[in-house]
Amino acid sequence: MNINNRIGIYPGTFDPITFGHIDIIKRACKLVDRLIIGVAENINKHTTFDAKLRTSMAENEIKRLEIDVDVVSFNGLLVKFAKEQNASVIIRGLRAVSDFDYEFQMSWVNYKLLPEIETIFLPASEDTQFISSSFVKEIARLGESVSKFVSVGVQKELINLNRIGSE
């Protein structure tokens, strides 16, 4: 791996993508030469939006930010996807201590599977540390504004989802 072309993967379900995710993406771009947003098609995790729509929402956010980041959906082991993308770094965001426990375990497993791929943890910024996709979906489901947590485009998808769900 050429150190002058460091590729990083920022994986997640992005169900939906929030300002917390965007914060990590912007900061991760400073650490790598090329960042790939890996939208996971996790069969063990029930998602509200399908992978195609989650990928589309992430792509729209990247276009809005005018940053050079690739968005790719993947399925299966994260380290396998990272290797396929020639990545040397996996970037994970941490909101709280509870995130660290899980993420630390996953980084250890990933290291055992592919030691040449490192994991970097980025703590959430103070103003995004309590944003979670689950909270955003619940607030939207209850009919409240989520404009402080997600973009207008994501808000529209949540409104559409809740409109369909109430029919």
From Swiss-Prot:
Gene3D superfamilies in the record: HUPs (3.40.50.620)
SUPFAM superfamilies on file: Nucleotidylyl transferase (SSF52374)
Assigned keywords, A-Z: ATP-binding, Coenzyme A biosynthesis, Cytoplasm, Magnesium, Nucleotide-binding, Nucleotidyltransferase, Transferase
Pfam families: CTP_transf_like (PF01467)
Listed pathway(s): Cofactor biosynthesis; coenzyme A biosynthesis; CoA from (R)-pantothenate: step 4/5
Binding site residues for substrate: 13, 45, 78, 92
UniProt cofactor(s): Mg(2+)
Predominant localisation class: cytoplasm
Binding-site positions, ATP: 13-14, 21, 93-95, 103, 128-134
InterPro entries: Cyt_trans-like (IPR004821), PPAT (IPR001980), Rossmann-like_a/b/a_fold (IPR014729)
Reaction equation(s) it catalyzes: (R)-4'-phosphopantetheine + ATP + H(+) = 3'-dephospho-CoA + diphosphate
Disulfide topology: none
EC numbers on record: 2.7.7.3
Record site: Transition state stabilizer: 21
One annotated GO biological process: coenzyme A biosynthetic process
Family statement drawn from the similarity comment of this UniProt entry: Belongs to the bacterial CoaD family.
Subunit structure as annotated in this protein's UniProt entry: Homohexamer.
Function noted in UniProt: Reversibly transfers an adenylyl group from ATP to 4'-phosphopantetheine, yielding dephospho-CoA (dPCoA) and pyrophosphate.
Protein name per Swiss-Prot or TrEMBL: Phosphopantetheine adenylyltransferase
Origin species: Wolbachia sp. subsp. Brugia malayi (strain TRS)
Lineage summary: Bacteria, Pseudomonadati, Pseudomonadota, Alphaproteobacteria, Rickettsiales
